[in-house]
Curated annotation (Swiss-Prot):
Family statement: Belongs to the MurCDEF family.
Location relative to the cell: Cytoplasm
Entry binding sites for ATP: 117-123
Xref: Pfam families: Mur_ligase_C, Mur_ligase_M, MurD-like_N
Stated name of the protein: UDP-N-acetylmuramoylalanine--D-glutamate ligase
Recorded name of the encoding gene: murD
Reactions catalysed according to its record: UDP-N-acetyl-alpha-D-muramoyl-L-alanine + D-glutamate + ATP = UDP-N-acetyl-alpha-D-muramoyl-L-alanyl-D-glutamate + ADP + phosphate + H(+)
Native organism: Chromobacterium violaceum (strain ATCC 12472 / DSM 30191 / JCM 1249 / CCUG 213 / NBRC 12614 / NCIMB 9131 / NCTC 9757 / MK)
Role: Cell wall formation. Catalyzes the addition of glutamate to the nucleotide precursor UDP-N-acetylmuramoyl-L-alanine (UMA).
């Protein structure tokens, strides 16, 4: 698409917004940026990248978008914003950065693998990227995982080197403003309550996820998730994965845990560096996606052995006095914490809490009753989690800080136990982000170890 001399307003000055502004300016667009409350750091970075670019600061209204032909909206900005909705009603075009990428690469020969879901998508995206590289493909991993897609696209255009495959992690927010993406293989890994502060209900949220299947590519679907099972689209090839039954990609539980492909045991899970049964599901999905674009199984299995996993995703921090300390700070919703607990084989002292984003915490109860010794609660929604678990028979304690909770968990844990930070909540009520929350946990674990030495 030709952006030369088009009046484009980039809405939201986060990482994807900054990348969009740079990309569009490089293609000759007349760029304006609008943000209700931009940080000084982002404004300074924008000025360094695009000196003199017009910036509209403050609540959006009709004047904010006056004269614009196209709005490029960042994922954190709801399309239901009254000024954006009015722009659309008046015939204005509103897209996101994924849509700009989709239009740019259409027909260029690159493969696209698209990954969404409530939980596990960052792990699966990273794993798929690793497996594609292991199979010899020039691979770009981008999207919701951290690298803005338009930053990656601009770099590739400037180098003149088209990748073999784009591996994209996509949030529901990104998919809302995406229309042309035609992935060669795509998955919705699972659906659990998340972002209900932005969606009417769980079905509304799930519907946004289904946009990943626009086009005619291979659908890789979770047979164990009822909402995902309902996403089959006529005319699409489908590959199923399951931990609990027969599927194209399944788990054998006799004689240890083995990954099965088309009924044949092909990989001993003991050879993976990832912990927990939920990561077996992630591996099955990744194999389905990679085989969906025609990659050979043998090279994929070799790649599985060398994937180390992601920071802050069920990551072992340390082990001393027979107690393992595991960081799952990226577990920001109930489904993620459920998965972490269900993947544990040792008794757990759980640290949870933060900003619950309107979730129902009831599903935590059976998972905690199965494996937890105690639950320590922090943050804004500690009381709501406590109410959901109050008749569970578990020891429940509230703590004012994560440092206090970590020290208390270490005191309650017995040799052979796991202290698990898996908050089931966002972090912004107490921390800069989930990585900051993780670092506080890691530092406190180190202090506990030093005090016991």
């Amino acid at each position: 698409m030709d952006y030369a001399n088009r009046h484009v307003t980039v809405v939201g000055l986060g990482g994807s917004g900054l990348a969009a502004a740079r990309y569009l300016a490089a293609h000759g667009a007349r760029v304006r940026v609008a943000d209700a409350n931009p940080s000084a750091e982002r404004l300074a970075e924008l000025e360094r990248c695009l000196p003199g670019v017009e910036v509209m600061v403050g609540a959006f209204d009709d004047a904010t978008f006056a004269g614009a032909e196209l709005l490029v909206v960042s994922p954190g900005v709801p399309l239901a914003n009254p000024a954006i909705a009015a722009f659309r009603r008046a015939g204005g075009e509103v897209v996101g950065d994924i849509e700009i990428l989709a239009r740019a690469i259409q027909g260029d020969g690159s493969k696209v693998i698209a990954i969404t879901g409530s939980n596990g998508k960052s792990t699966v995206t990273s794993l798929v990227g690793h497996l594609c590289e292991a199979a010899g493909l020039d691979t770009v991993v981008a999207g919701n995982i951290g690298l803005a897609v338009l930053e990656a696209l601009l770099a590739r255009e400037q180098s003149g080197k088209r990748p073999d495959v784009w591996v994209l992690e996509l949030s529901s927010f990104q998919l809302e403003s995406t229309f042309s993406l035609a992935a060669d293989a795509a998955t919705v890994l699972n659906i659990s309550e998340d972002h209900l502060d932005r969606y009417a209900d769980l079905l509304d949220y799930a519907h946004a996820k289904t946009r990943v299947f626009n086009g005619k590519g291979v659908q890789v679907l979770n047979k164990d998730d009822a909402l995902v099972r309902a996403m089959v689209r006529p005319g699409h090839p489908v590959k199923w994965f399951s931990l609990n039954g027969a599927a194209d990609y399944a788990l054998a539980r006799n004689g240890g845990y083995w990954l099965k492909v088309d009924g044949e045991k092909v990989f001993d899970c003991a050879d993976m560096q990832l912990q927990g049964l939920h990561n077996a599901a992630n591996a099955l999905a990744a194999l389905g996606l990679c085989q969906g674009i025609g990659l050979p199984l043998e090279k994929l299995l070799d790649g599985l052995k060398t994937f180390r996993g992601l920071a802050h995703r069920v990551e072992l921090v340390d082990e001393f006095d027979g107690i393992a300390f595991i960081d799952d700070s990226k577990g920001t919703n109930v489904g993620a914490t459920e998965a972490a607990l269900n993947g544990m084989t040792r008794q757990v002292v759980l640290i949870a809490g933060g900003d619950g984003k309107g979730q129902d915490f009831a599903p935590l109860k059976p998972a905690c009753q199965r494996i937890a010794r105690a639950v320590l609660l922090i943050g804004r929604d500690a009381g709501r989690i406590e109410a959901a678990l109050e008749d569970s028979g578990l020891a429940l304690e509230r703590c004012d800080t994560l440092e206090e909770a970590t020290r208390r968990a270490a005191a309650l844990a017995r040799p052979g136990d796991v202290v698990l930070l898996s908050p089931a909540c966002a972090s912004l009520d107490m921390f800069k982000n989930y990585a900051h929350r993780a670092q506080v946990f890691i530092d406190t674990v180190a202090a506990v170890k030093a005090a016991r030495a």
